């Protein structure tokens, strides 16, 4: 058996007849499966034990030899070898076909490989293969053309004309096989290369395609005639099993039926040939054999599929590989896991950040082997069997053992759908009663979990290594930051926010105002006994909190604060300043001086002078967590988060905030605002009736009026609201709801969208407190339904997008420390018109500089070349007035099959420099795919206004970008760099013409009349600049500009979509994806290389091919970059295993087999498929080939070893 972790690559080729015979353990001659009386396999049948091995371990068919001691003996009575029954999953048989049969993949696939090899059309091939026409194989001295087709009648006429034996013509796959044997690959290739020099158009395309296939045969050593089968392999019987059902009936795999048809027809053909039957009968039988083999290989590819009972098409070998239920996706990429369970989740507010509650009966089942081992070790039972019985009986002693066993043994919790890496995290189990898993409330956001009936799965890591990885890398307390943007993902929500908001409120004139306390305990005692209110402003001695970072002038003084804030600051990490105001200045620079009493000053006087501070909201808590993480990293942060959670829950309970209908305020001047709007609409309609405006203008004016009315109500609502109103507190604190929910409760619901996406002119004037009329209710139902269906569709679309993204980037891994490139990316803030989408500061954080950055005025070097830009450094650069910086970027990284650490920058999930081995491709795909469900689905209809600029937004736009499709509402771009000299309008053709004068000549662009112009006369434009509003077609931009311009454009476009929906994603994730779309080039002129024109290949392979030629003084090849959509890029990957498991399985495998492709197992998917440890993270060779050594001999890993690995994952393997 091959050790899966040792082999280096996997190759797939066409099987020659001798190869199939070498695999086979015997010929299957009969269509029988098993004897229905004895239930034993029939001899020479599809389940024969002589061919495929015994059905029971170490036992021959007749029972003469039983037990392992006869291992390897072949029984002299029944001929069965005594071995394991498992060989029935491995041993193959074969069928000797009495007539050659074509392989449907190679004849029917697009393009038809047989057709290209023989230069025949697929239709002609079909006629020959299915016995509708003769093909001339050897015309000898007759004027017939080789490969020309003759009908039955023409064939007879030609025979009479030229005499018998004067030429050779045949029909069926036999004829095709003869033709394929006659193909002289070398001569044909030379001829085609010659033809390419002069050919153009359709002829050239065909020549390139033929050359591609012939060259593949030539290089791989496959012979073209192997596309026709003379011998058919029979797959092992345990892969096409027969199982007995309860009623004594059998359920068999469809493959058995398909094989049975082939054997029946083959045997009948053999008999007919023996009997010398008439030619037409033999022909018919050969055609039926051909169809039977077609159905076995790919049922339904040609003609109507063969059906089983109930007219259900039978599943052929191809169907076994294809799709979600196929071999690749069902059994190889994901398997069911042992030691796992699932249950409903409930909240566990008392748990620590790294804990989860596991029900006892679940734990005893999951940890059974561990418990049994301990039972035997403690000598409660003599052997494992007895120990097992003890566990099953529920002996009292097992619970104490279980407690010991689970201590320090982390488990993994997973919630489907797992959209990003935070969907699986490790926790330490805590045994609980009941049947639901308990989950810490703060990790809910990462899982997107709530407690309305969600279920989660639990898995137990078994080996020591797996436990160590779970504990060190996956523990929930380590996952504070979100990998997509580096912001904390564990921010408190709902009750926790509300409690802390209530706690930090300030109020004037409450009981106890102006009291002064010596320390926290005294203040709490006063509050508990009713002398001081939580919100009243009091004084406290600064010296009672000696560990806080006070300024020197603040020590030994009295500080004005509230009792609530004393409690709030008590849970903060000691080195954080005392928080009085919810802003960044207080958090980073310390407590403001205005809160401190000067000696002899009256406290009431200071209190009266101070403004009342707003309480701490959800956003402020997020900032505090981020700052804590920045200063103290994970351990202290997770402990702080637990304290924050407990405090929030405690005080939201004490505050007792409830919501009743009386809490919804009534707006005093609602009637006035609505009457004014009615009046305005009436005026607009009057103007329209008089012909002063068009219908479109009227529609826009009416909808704008109602929108403004709604905004006026909203504004009034905010002005008149009571800050102590529970609904206002919920909204203001960020616990639940926003102003739009609030204004629907108290203001008006406003305009609704009609089923066609257009906004209806009639608004809903009522709010939910007043209640809606029947008509208003009816209007609003459409929006509600649309919301539901949109969500359902969006989830599926977003999931499929993630799958394609993961597929295209799964082999991008951090391979080395520094690629040493001299290229960089010039970045500035991303803008959309006047608005800034992403600031320069955000784009700089966590990246390495390519060149040093100087102060624009003083010329002082702010940061050197190749230095990491921290958050503070980025702020310093922006504050200095620098507008653009050249950084190291994934786009310009020179590492093969991955990225280097310097071009990538920091790992957003940890805030530290990225490690070699990090699977950044997968992280990038998840970061872009996970927020996909938050994006909108719709294309906005602006209601007939400027209708041709309906902009695609949200998820459809993201798909459009990543699939490199032509965008809707495409912008016209200029190919000339220069100045816009004239824009003329042509009323007759309803177009505008834009003239751009460049150095080399004038560019003239015709633009539709309705398009909105982006340029004016006199503007200077660069090549590839958009002249009109709209999206640029990236493929067109690639023709006009260079690769880097397209990459920069795509990056900016993706960011615009996400940022407009309020989703932040790190640039580097988009860079990784976009780079994968542009990694191929198309060879234009091969020069002196042996590349073929028109070939699509990796840039690195192309450079290698040219390097050798340039060294030897030849002419290098030229190429042009190609932009591929992510689906196409996934299918064009160098790994055929990865591509086949993605989509179009049969096409990928057909192509790979002809080329004799080798998969070097560089990506993650291909290693998962063959069951090898993945070459990322701790699976990388540099981390696995480590020998334990004495301390003094240890050296740092040499970087040469790393870059060698980057070229090929450890040749040592």
UniProtKB/Swiss-Prot annotation:
Superkingdom of origin: Bacteria
Pfam families linked:
RNA_pol_Rpb1_1 (PF04997), RNA_pol_Rpb1_2 (PF00623), RNA_pol_Rpb1_3 (PF04983), RNA_pol_Rpb1_4 (PF05000), RNA_pol_Rpb1_5 (PF04998)
Cofactor remark from the record: Binds 1 Mg(2+) ion per subunit.
The positions annotated for binding Mg(2+) are 450, 452, 454
> NCBIfam families, alphabetically?
rpoC_TIGR (TIGR02386)
Family, according to the entry, reads as follows: Belongs to the RNA polymerase beta' chain family.
Cite the PANTHER family for this sequence: DNA-DIRECTED RNA POLYMERASE (PTHR19376), DNA-DIRECTED RNA POLYMERASE SUBUNIT BETA (PTHR19376:SF54)
What is the protein's given name? DNA-directed RNA polymerase subunit beta'
């Amino acid at each position: 058996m091959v050790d899966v972790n040792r082999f280096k690559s996997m190759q797939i080729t066409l099987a020659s007849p001798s190869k199939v015979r070498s695999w086979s353990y015997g010929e299957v001659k009969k269509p029988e499966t098993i004897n229905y009386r004895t239930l034993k396999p029939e001899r020479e049948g599809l389940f024969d034990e002589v061919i495929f091995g015994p059905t029971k371990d170490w036992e021959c068919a007749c029972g003469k030899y039983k037990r392992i001691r006869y291992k390897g003996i072949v029984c002299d009575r029944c001929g069965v070898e005594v071995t394991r029954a498992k060989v029935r999953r491995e041993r193959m048989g074969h069928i000797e076909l009495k007539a050659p049969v074509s392989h449907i993949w190679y004849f029917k696939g697009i393009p038809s490989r047989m057709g290209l090899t023989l230069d025949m059309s697929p239709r002609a091939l079909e006629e020959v293969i299915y016995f509708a026409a003769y093909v001339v194989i050897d015309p000898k001295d007759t004027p017939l053309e080789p490969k020309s087709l003759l009908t039955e009648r023409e064939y007879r006429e030609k025979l009479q004309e030229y005499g018998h034996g004067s030429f050779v013509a045949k029909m069926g796959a036999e004829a095709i096989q003869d033709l394929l044997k006659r193909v002289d690959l070398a001569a044909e290739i030379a001829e085609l290369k010659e033809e390419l020099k002069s050919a153009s158009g359709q002829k050239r395309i065909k020549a390139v395609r033929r050359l591609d296939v012939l060259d593949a045969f030539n290089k791989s050593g496959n012979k073209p005639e192997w596309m026709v089968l003379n011998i058919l392999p029979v797959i092992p019987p345990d892969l096409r099993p027969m199982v007995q059902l309860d009623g004594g009936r059998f359920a068999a795999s469809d493959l058995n039926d398909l094989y049975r048809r082939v054997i029946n027809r083959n045997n009948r053909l053999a008999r007919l040939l023996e009997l010398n039957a008439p030619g037409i009968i033999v022909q018919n039988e050969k055609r039926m054999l051909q169809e039977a083999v077609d159905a076995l290989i790919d049922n339904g590819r040609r003609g109507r599929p063969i059906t089983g009972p109930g007219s259900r098409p039978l599943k052929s070998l191809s169907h076994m590989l294809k799709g979600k239920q196929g071999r690749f996706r069902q059994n190889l990429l994901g398997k069911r896991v042992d030691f796992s369970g699932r249950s409903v989740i409930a909240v566990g507010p008392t748990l620590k950040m790294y804990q989860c509650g596991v029900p006892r009966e679940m734990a005893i089942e999951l940890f059974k082997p561990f418990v049994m081992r301990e039972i035997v070790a403690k000598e409660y039972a003599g052997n494992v069997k007895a120990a097992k019985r003890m566990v099953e009986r529920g002996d009292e002693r097992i619970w104490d053992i279980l407690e010991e066993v689970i201590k320090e043994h982390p488990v993994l919790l997973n919630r489907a759908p797992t959209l990003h890496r935070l969907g699986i995290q490790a926790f330490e189990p805590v045994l609980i009663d009941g049947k639901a898993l308990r989950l810490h409330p703060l990790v809910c956001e990462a899982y997107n979990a709530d407690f309305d009936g969600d279920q989660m799965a639990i898995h137990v890591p078994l080996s020591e290594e797996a436990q160590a990885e779970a504990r060190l890398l996956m523990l929930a307390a380590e996952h504070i930051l979100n990998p997509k943007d580096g912001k904390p993902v564990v921010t408190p929500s709902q009750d926790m926010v509300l409690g802390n908001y209530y706690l930090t409120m300030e109020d004037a004139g409450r009981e106890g105002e102006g009291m002064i306390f010596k320390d926290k305990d005294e203040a709490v005692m006063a509050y508990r006994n009713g002398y001081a209110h939580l919100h009243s402003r009091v004084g406290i001695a600064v010296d009672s909190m000696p560990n806080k970072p006070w300024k020197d002038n603040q020590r030994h003084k009295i500080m004005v604060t509230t009792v609530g804030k004393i409690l709030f600051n008590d849970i903060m990490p000691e080195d954080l300043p005392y928080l009085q105001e919810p802003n960044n200045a207080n958090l980073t620079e310390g407590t403001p001086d205005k809160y401190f009493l000067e000696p002899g000053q009256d406290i009431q006087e200071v209190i009266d002078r101070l403004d009342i501070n707003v309480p701490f909201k959800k956003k402020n808590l997020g900032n505090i967590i981020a700052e804590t993480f920045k200063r103290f990293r994970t351990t202290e942060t997770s402990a702080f988060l637990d304290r924050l959670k407990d405090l929030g829950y405690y005080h939201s309970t004490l505050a007792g905030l409830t919501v009743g209908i009386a809490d919804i305020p009534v707006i005093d001047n609602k009637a006035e605002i609505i009457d004014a709007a009615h009046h305005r609409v009436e005026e607009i309609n009057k103007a329209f009736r008089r012909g002063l405006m068009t219908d479109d203008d009227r529609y826009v004016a009416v909808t704008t009026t109602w929108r403004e009315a709604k905004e006026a109500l909203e504004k009034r609502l905010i002005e008149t609201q009571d800050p102590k109103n529970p609904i206002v507190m919920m909204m203001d604190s960020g616990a639940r709801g926003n102003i739009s929910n609030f204004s629907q409760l108290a203001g008006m619901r406003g305009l609704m969208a009609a089923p066609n996406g257009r906004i209806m002119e009639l608004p809903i004037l009522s709010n939910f407190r007043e209640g809606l009329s029947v008509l208003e209710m009816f209007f609003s139902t459409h929006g509600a339904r649309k919301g539901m269906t949109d969500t359902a569709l969006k989830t599926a679309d977003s999931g499929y997008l993630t799958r394609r993204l993961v597929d295209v980037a799964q082999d991008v891994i951090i391979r080395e420390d520094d690629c040493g490139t001299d290229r960089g990316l010039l970045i500035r803030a991303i803008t959309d018109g006047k608005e800034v989408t992403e600031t320069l500061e955000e784009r700089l954080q966590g990246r390495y500089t390519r060149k040093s950055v100087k102060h624009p005025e003083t010329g002082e070097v702010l940061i050197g070349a190749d230095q990491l830009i921290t958050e503070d450094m980025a702020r310093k650069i922006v504050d200095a007035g620098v507008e653009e910086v050249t950084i190291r970027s994934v786009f310009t990284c020179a590492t093969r099959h991955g990225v280097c650490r310097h071009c990538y920058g920091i790992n957003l999930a940890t805030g530290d420099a990225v490690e070699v081995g990090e699977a950044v491709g997968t992280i990038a795909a998840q970061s872009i795919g996970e927020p996909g469900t938050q994006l909108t689905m719709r294309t906005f209809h602006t209601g007939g206004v400027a209708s041709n600029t309906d902009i695609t937004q949200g998820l459809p736009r993201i798909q459009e970008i990543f699939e490199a499709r032509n965008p809707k509402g495409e912008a016209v771009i200029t190919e000339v760099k220069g100045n816009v000299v004239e824009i003329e309008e042509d009323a007759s053709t309803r177009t505008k013409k834009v003239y751009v004068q460049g150095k080399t000549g004038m560019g003239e662009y015709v633009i539709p009349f309705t398009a909105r112009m982006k340029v004016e006369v006199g503007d200077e434009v660069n090549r590839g600049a958009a002249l009109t509003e709209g999206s640029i077609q990236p493929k067109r931009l690639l023709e006009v500009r260079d690769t880097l311009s397209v990459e920069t454009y795509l990056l900016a476009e993706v960011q615009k979509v996400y940022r407009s929906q309020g989703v932040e994603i790190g640039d580097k994730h988009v860079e990784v994806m976009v780079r994968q779309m542009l990694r191929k080039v198309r060879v234009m002129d091969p020069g002196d290389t042996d590349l073929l024109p028109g070939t699509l290949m990796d840039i690195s392979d192309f450079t290698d091919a040219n390097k050798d030629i340039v060294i030897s003084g030849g002419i290098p090849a030229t190429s042009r970059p190609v932009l591929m959509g992510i689906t196409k890029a996934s299918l064009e990957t160098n790994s055929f295993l990865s591509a086949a498991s993605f989509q179009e399985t049969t096409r990928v495998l057909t192509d790979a087999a002809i080329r004799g492709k080798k998969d070097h197992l560089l990506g993650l998917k291909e290693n998962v498929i063959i069951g090898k440890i993945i070459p990322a993270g701790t699976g990388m060779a540099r981390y696995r080939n480590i020998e334990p050594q004495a301390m003094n001999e240890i050296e740092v890993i040499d970087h040469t070893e790393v870059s060698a690995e980057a070229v090929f994952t450890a040749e040592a393997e």
